[in-house]
């Protein structure tokens, strides 16, 4: 959690350092698809992780980390979180909840420290994800990220 005076990438770096987490932030051109983004970064689509913000009915949020080529399984995630209703908030609510615009969202440096749920397929790999700013991505060891956030690891996705 940060005070909002830093840029997105600076917030990511500061939070990662505070957690003892090694991240590599790169600049990259915009991509029109998951496959194009993977090609630009020299990785496979499954190694690109989407940080999705989900809103619970009590107006609290959680981060759901989902690998490329997969989507949230709403029944699985609702059961895991013990709620009857979840939704993806609109862009303005996601920004208010995290301090990041869609396409840049990451739990690192979020303006509010929401719980993190990681799909089981992400564990054990080096992944890329949003770095707090458009035109940047970060690389991180998924297991180290999971430990840094004391994240819940579970089967929360299904194929797209």
Residues of each region from the PLM?
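Extended, low-hydrophobicity, polar/charged segments
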Residues: 1-160
